[in-house]
Every structure is written in C-alpha cells, then in structure tokens.
Amino acid sequence: LFARYGIPVPAGHVASTPEEAVDAARRRGGAVWVVKAQVHAGGRGKAGGVKVVKSVADVKSAAAGMLGQRLKTKQTVAEGLPINQVYVETGSKIERELYLSLLLNRDTGRIAFVASQAGGMDIEAVAAKTPGKIIRVEVHPATGLQGSHCRALAFGLGLKGEQVKQFESIARGLYKLYLECDCSLVEINPLIVTGDGGVMALDAKINIEENALFRQKELLAWRDPSQEDEMERIAGEADLNYVSLDGDIACMVN
C-alpha cells in the first residue's frame, strides 16, 4: 500500500512456512535479512517479533520460532495474537530512526502530522517524558497539505538538502493515502535515514475507519479475522459495539 503511494519501503516477501521464508531470503539476496511476525499490533520488536539475521539458515530458524506461536505486546490482548505469517525483507543500514504519523485532531477538525527525532521507540513514553521532542503540524482539510507544512516537519526532524525533498514526497504520499483510504491513523515507526542518506519507511501501522469500510472493498478483503478478538468480531457481525476487557469486573453506565 505504501509503495502504491510512492512511499519507499524495503523489498520483501510474505512467508507462511520456514521454507517459504528461506525462498524469500534467497530471492531478495544480500547478506542481512529481517524476519518480522505479521500480527496486527505494534511493539513487536521488544516482544521478539522482529529478528535481524545474517544467514539463510538463521532466516529459517527465526521463521520456525515465530510461525504457529502467539505474540504478546503492550497492544495485544492478554493471550497475544497468532503468528500465521512472517515478512522477510532485505536488511537496511540505519543511520537515524525517526517517527512520523498522521491522525485526526477531533478538537480542531484538522489533520495532524506528529513527528519526532526519537523514532524506533514507544512514542507514548517519549511524549510523556520528553514532550519537547514531539513535533505537531496541523493541516486544514480545505487548503490541504502545503510545502510549508512539509518543510516545517523536515527541518524539525533534522533533515537537510535532498532529504527534505524526499521527505516532502513521503509526506504527500502519506496524506493522500490517509484521505483516499479513509484512515484514522497512519504511523511510520521508524522512518529511517539510510546509510546513503535516503529516507525510507521501515515499519508502519495503518488503521482504517470501520464506518468507511463499505467503500474500501480492496482493504476489506485483506481483513484477517484471526487477528481480531473473537467476541468483538462476533458482536461486529451483529452490528453491535463491544469492547473486550480483561478481568471480571464491569461497570455499565447510561
């Protein structure tokens, strides 16, 4: 989806078995690969869902260790989410890790870019402990994204020269994706500066507004029920709103 909107990403392939993971690594070539558990949650790296490996044998071992298991992160339910597939991509040389996201500010009715030079980390913790590291630029829907918005973000992230142009292209692609795909959140963490000075999205998360799924047929076809809470899924099929919580104490308020 990112590639469709002109946002550079590492080349890679999805694999459902360790053998497919090995085949993916060989097709990509190189000397370093990253094996990523495909679950609908952030925080995979800290939970062991992202492995950097330097041999095809280790690609197979990493995939075998993930597939069929459940991954538990701060963003999953207590029992974690099943790992049915892994993504094998070419390793990238990372000079800097940045953060970039796009969401709606419901208070102002504007679309907000949130960025930080502290990428690759828990952004909520960064915002709580060092709010000065968070950059916010809001875009009025009537005027749309302007070059000044992009430059303010790029300079705030410490980008220079050609990197600013690359970033503007990424920001414009992100903004277009956000609008056309009816997103409630698009997050890149990390957005990296590569060894040759390029800018690339290394990992991402996209949330689609559920009330708009009726006009997002292609994205709806990608939905994976195994990554959803079963009770929430059943309630949704009955057109009911239900939020699954841990524990056995509840409060009903009218």
Predicted regions located by residue number:
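ATP-dependent carboxylate/acyl-activation modules
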Residues: 1-187, 192-254
